[in-house]
Structures are given as C-alpha cells and as structure tokens.
C-alpha cells in the first residue's frame, strides 16, 4: 500500500512481537 503504512507497521510489529514474546 502506502510507504507510510509500511513505516507504521515496521514500528508496531516489533513492539507487538516484543510484548508477546516478552523479549525486548
């Protein structure tokens, strides 16, 4: 889609993964 969407996803995905895996 839009580059802006990819940027937001790039910030959200690691955060969500961090919260789920408990490994930051």
Swiss-Prot record:
InterPro entries: Antimicrobial_frog_1. Expressed by the skin glands. Its main location: secreted. One of its GO terms (biological process) is defense response to bacterium. Pfam families: Antimicrobial_1. It is found in: Secreted. GO terms for cellular component: extracellular region. Keywords: Amphibian defense peptide, Antibiotic, Antimicrobial, Disulfide bond, Secreted. Disulfide bonds join 18-24. The keyword Methyltransferase does not apply. Has antibacterial activity against the Gram-positive bacterium S.aureus ATCC 25923 (MIC=3 uM) and the Gram-negative bacterium E.coli ATCC 25726 (MIC=24 uM). Belongs to the frog skin active peptide (FSAP) family. Brevinin subfamily. This is Brevinin-1HSa. It comes from Odorrana hosii.
């Amino acid at each position: 889609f839009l580059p802006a969407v990819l940027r937001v996803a790039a910030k959200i995905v690691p955060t969500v993964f961090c919260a789920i895996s408990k490994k930051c």
